[in-house]
Amino acid sequence: MAAGPRTSVLLAFALLCLPWTQEVGAFPAMPLSSLFANAVLRAQHLHQLAADTYKEFERAYIPEGQRYSIQNTQAAFCFSETIPAPTGKDEAQQRSDVELLRFSLLLIQSWLGPVQFLSRVFTNSLVFGTSDRVYEKLKDLEEGIQALMRELEDGSPRAGQILKQTYDKFDTNMRSDDALLKNYGLLSCFKKDLHKAETYLRVMKCRRFVESSCAF
């Protein structure tokens, strides 16, 4: 392996292992650039995990001929679409960093309850063997976003919008067609919401710290 790629991989792993700053005034304080880099890496990892889980579930349980029609039904509707959040990179660039952080936090927090049931639903024969750690990873990203909010809001983040609705828990009755459709829809929303959160964080990081990876 060339020195350049190997160094990048080691750096990424090191950033994933870094703890977040617990207090704004803590010493030594983590630079803002590192906070953003840490958050982006965690969001990318979660988004990829969600995408892999969705694909594996689809391959295992959803007949190929039914996938398109199911994706266009109410089961595929994500309630997060009712939040006035940007739907893509271009819209995200029109919002302030604080707004994007609040939207990211809302998206992450809306899944903290439902994902606790993932490990009860999926078997270890699938990719879901890591599902019992998804909650921990989401909590870690939530903490990172809150650390960024403290930095950008001078240590006193204002109360954000409170979600009046959250996602249902995953259905453990995998022999039911209704349960399969429900879980399929939830996994689709989970993937979409994590993609949004990742996009928001990458937009913020790129416009604050111009770099070659800004093209996405």
UniProtKB/Swiss-Prot annotation:
Residues 1-26 form the signal peptide. The modification Phosphoserine is found at residue 131. PROSITE patterns: SOMATOTROPIN_1, SOMATOTROPIN_2. CDD domains: somatotropin_like. GO terms for molecular function: growth factor activity; growth hormone receptor binding; hormone activity; metal ion binding. Disulfide bonds join 78-189, 206-214. One of its GO terms (biological process) is animal organ development. It is found in: Secreted. GO terms for cellular component: extracellular space. Zn(2+) binds at residues 45, 198. Keywords: Disulfide bond, Hormone, Metal-binding, Phosphoprotein, Secreted, Signal, Zinc. Plays an important role in growth control. Its major role in stimulating body growth is to stimulate the liver and other tissues to secrete IGF1. It stimulates both the differentiation and proliferation of myoblasts. It also stimulates amino acid uptake and protein synthesis in muscle and other tissues. Belongs to the somatotropin/prolactin family. This is Somatotropin. It comes from Hippopotamus amphibius (Hippopotamus).
